């Protein structure tokens, strides 16, 4: 697949300067997003509960996402408020205000809730009551969720560095410099942390597995090779969290490829041309990607063979895909939640979540989907 000069120009404005296509100041110059198509609703979407936890700064809507552990959902907002919600009814179990500008989170691991700040601070909170366990300082702004395996906390920073902090004290154990290029998409990949591996994507298009104890390299794989004469053309960032399914890792780059790799060795199993800054999703033996220009695509997980593409949400600023029961869900900047059939990608359901729009990655919890809107409302949906 090739990406047009138009797409490159549009996306450079969208991701680097933070422009939006809905409600812009210069309506004559704006490129019009796709109108919503009419279709027959095949599923009934039920709102289980909704709770307000605070609003998101426009620059950090993509990086503040909910996370879950057991019967609790943890959320955060840009003003430093971190909230624990009961997963069954959305009621607040606790809420604390850190009085800092939170830019990345929320992460969970080993009984801790973790967030990062604009100033490069990492906060670890007790998941039972929100009390601060420790704080730590890293090199720069944190716009991804810290992750922990109970021994370390992995934190990626906007200058493309990876830090491993002691999970008990917050002290630095090791760090890795991703050697960031001159120009990159604003965003960082979220690490996947297990007992024997820290898996991280970098702005160079490399996916790297580290020993969590000392940071030594286990393997390194390049998903995409920078091409072109300009720095803009050569951007191949990995900004979406790698997806681990059994012994296979799925990851996608901007202006590059979607790939499946062996967890143990990093050996490539298949590649397909693709471009995305979202994490892929997996369901029913297929991998789903929200690509730039907001096409949603499905690939066979085993071979990478393309299955379908839905281009009817062009430039609606979609979230990454998520699973909701037997459907694939994406949300957009106008606040609509769209459900697609995993077999051929046609629309099967739609509901208006909130007029403020949805930017944060959505969270699948069992048969429910947790959606955090830009105005700070957190809502749980399921199919009737």
Give the ranges of each region predicted by the language model.
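C-terminal motif of bacterial Sec signal peptides marking the signal peptidase cleavage site
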Residues: 16-18
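Extracytoplasmic beta-rich repeat domains
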Residues: 27, 42-65, 94-109, 132-149, ...
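Short loop/turn segments that connect beta-strands within beta-propeller blades
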Residues: 86-89, 126-129, 166-169, 212-214, ...
């Amino acid at each position: 697949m090739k990406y047009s000069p138009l797409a490159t120009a549009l996306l450079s404005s969208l991701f680097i300067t933070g422009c939006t296509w809905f409600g812009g100041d210069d309506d004559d110059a704006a490129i019009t997003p796709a109108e919503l198509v009419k279709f027959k609703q095949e599923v009934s979407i039920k709102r289980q509960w909704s709770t307000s936890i605070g609003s998101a700064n426009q620059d950090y809507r993509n990086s503040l996402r909910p996370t879950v552990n057991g019967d609790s959902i943890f959320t955060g907002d840009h003003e430093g408020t971190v909230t624990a919600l009961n997963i069954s009814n959305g009621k607040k179990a606790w809420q604390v205000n850190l009085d800092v500008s939170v830019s990345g989170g929320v992460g969970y691991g080993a009984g801790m809730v973790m967030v990062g700040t604009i100033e490069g601070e990492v906060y670890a909170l007790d998941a039972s009551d929100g009390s601060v366990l420790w704080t730590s300082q890293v090199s720069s702004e944190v716009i991804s969720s810290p992750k922990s395996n109970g021994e370390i906390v992995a934190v990626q920073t906007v200058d493309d560095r990876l830090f491993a902090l002691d999970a008990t004290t917050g002290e630095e154990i090791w760090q890795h410099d991703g050697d960031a290029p001159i120009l990159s998409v604003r965003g960082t990949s979220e690490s996947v942390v297990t007992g024997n591996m820290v898996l991280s994507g970098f702005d160079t298009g490399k996916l790297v597995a580290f020993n969590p104890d000392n940071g030594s390299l286990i393997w390194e794989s390049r998903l995409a090779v920078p091409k072109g004469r300009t720095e803009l053309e050569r951007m191949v960032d990995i900004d979406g969290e790698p997806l681990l399914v059994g012994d296979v890792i799925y990851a996608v780059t901007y202006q590059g490829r979607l790939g499946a790799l062996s967890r143990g060795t990093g050996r490539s199993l298949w590649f397909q041309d693709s471009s995305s800054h979202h994490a892929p999703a997996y369901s029913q033996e297929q991998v789903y990607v929200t690509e730039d220009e907001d096409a949603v695509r499905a690939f066979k997980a085993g071979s990478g063979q393309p299955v379908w593409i839905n281009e009817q949400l062009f430039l609606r600023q979609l979230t990454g895909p998520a699973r909701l029961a037997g459907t694939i869900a994406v949300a957009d900047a106008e606040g609509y939640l769209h459900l697609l059939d995993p077999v051929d990608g046609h629309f099967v359901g739609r509901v208006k979540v909130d007029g403020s729009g949805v930017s944060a990655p959505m969270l699948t919890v069992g048969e429910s989907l947790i959606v955090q809107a830009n105005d700070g409302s957190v809502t749980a949906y399921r199919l009737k």
